[in-house]
Regions:
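C-terminal subregions of glycosyltransferases and related glycan-biosynthesis enzymes
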Residues: 3-6, 201, 213, 219-329
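Conserved nucleotide-sugar donor-binding catalytic segment
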Residues: 18, 94, 133, 147-236
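Acidic helix N-cap motif at the loop->helix transition within catalytic regions
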Residues: 27-30, 55-65, 109, 113
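A conserved acidic beta->alpha catalytic loop
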Residues: 35, 42, 50-60, 105
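Short aromatic/hydrophobic "clamp" motif used to bind/position activated sugar donors
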Residues: 101
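Conserved donor NDP-sugar-binding/catalytic core segment of glycosyltransferases
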Residues: 113-145
Length: 329
């Protein structure tokens, strides 16, 4: 019996509303919707918000909605002028009727049992308001490029999320989500992080981890997360809001946060081909907290990847291909 097989949550727990913002995802939307419809939860409401797509995504959603039939299945399509991910999610949340609300992405794939496992995690621990499962990283062709390792603790709080926001495809108690307030539509990145830390500021360490791979997180060119400068700027805006509310980690923890964030930005810069920035950011991370970087296996790998950009291009490319092949194995 797998971990997912062992998870159960009674059907009487009610409707799960899945909010799915969509913008120019025509190549992926049908598979994403099918993976949600195929969940074994008995009452799933899908609210798809087309955010002014130009590639026919909205029309595809309308056609998929006409085929979304059967007991315990409801689908609504909202179409709006392009206003950004935050506005699209807010529109979907406002329309949701379920006791549980999931925020999924329109180019990702939900594995069987995802919804049930997330609801079960929240039902098993009343102190949790949000649950997410581990996930695989896939490219535009669906080829697996890596997997998210489990964090050191099964319950995460504000500091953990500000160091490394691992949350993807979360499911939340509707009342907790609405109490935390709408997503900040002025942010251009880390929109979800801003919401998550508002949830954990209301109830500390209220984010739970389901320790099995239950979704595919698609990495594509042009995604917001590919722009390390935008990510850094908006992370700073989230931090400023937290600090205005009294968030003040002690110096040692602040150094740890600085190290992890700079290494994350270094990784984004490396993936974008900005190798000079990757090396500079990695050096800052190492200076901030050498023990945190060198004492962590993933940290060492990221650091070595940035350092390898100093090698001749042919050797660096060969090492990168070998590393990617090992991650996908």
């Amino acid at each position: 019996m797998t971990h997912v097989d062992a998870i159960s949550a009674p059907a009487a727990l009610g409707r799960v509303s899945v909010v799915l913002p969509a913008y120019d995802v025509a190549p992926f939307i049908e598979d994403a919707v099918a993976s949600i419809r195929g969940q074994d939860w008995p009452d799933v409401e899908l609210i798809a918000v087309d955010d002014g797509s130009r590639d026919g995504t909205g029309d595809m959603l309308e056609a998929l909605s006409a085929r979304w039939t059967g007991a315990g299945r409801a689908m609504r399509v909202i179409r709006q002028a392009n206003a950004g991910a935050g506005a699209a999610r807010n529109a979907g949340i406002a329309a949701a009727t379920g006791a549980w609300i999931a925020l999924y992405d329109a180019d990702d794939i939900c594995h069987p049992g995802l919804v049930r496992a997330q609801v079960a995690a929240l039902e098993a621990d009343p102190a949790l308001d949000l649950a997410f499962a581990l996930y695989r990283y896939v490219d535009e062709d669906g080829i697996v490029r890596g997997a998210q390792a489990a964090p050191a603790t099964a319950r995460l709080g504000t500091f953990d999320l500000m160091c490394d926001n691992l949350v993807h495809a979360p499911l939340m108690r509707a009342r907790a989500l609405r109490a935390a307030g709408p997503l900040d539509e002025n942010l251009r990145a880390h929109i979800d992080l801003d919401l998550f830390v508002r949830i954990t500021e209301r109830r500390p360490r209220s984010v739970g981890v389901v320790p099995c791979m239950l979704s595919d997180y698609r990495r594509r060119d042009g995604q917001i997360t590919a722009d390390w400068r935008r990510m850094r700027e908006n992370w700073g805006r989230v931090l400023a809001k937290l600090e205005a509310g009294g968030f003040a980690p002690p110096p040692a923890r602040r150094r740890l946060m600085r190290a992890r964030l700079h290494l994350y930005w270094a990784t984004l810069a490396y993936q974008a081909g900005d190798h000079a920035a990757a090396r500079r950011l990695a050096r800052t991370a190492l200076r901030a907290d050498p023990g945190a970087i060198l004492g962590d296996g993933h940290g060492r790998v990221r650091l070595m990847a940035c350092a390898a950009t100093l090698l001749p291009a042919s050797l660096h490319d060969a090492l990168r291909r070998r590393f990617n092949a090992r991650r996908a194995a």
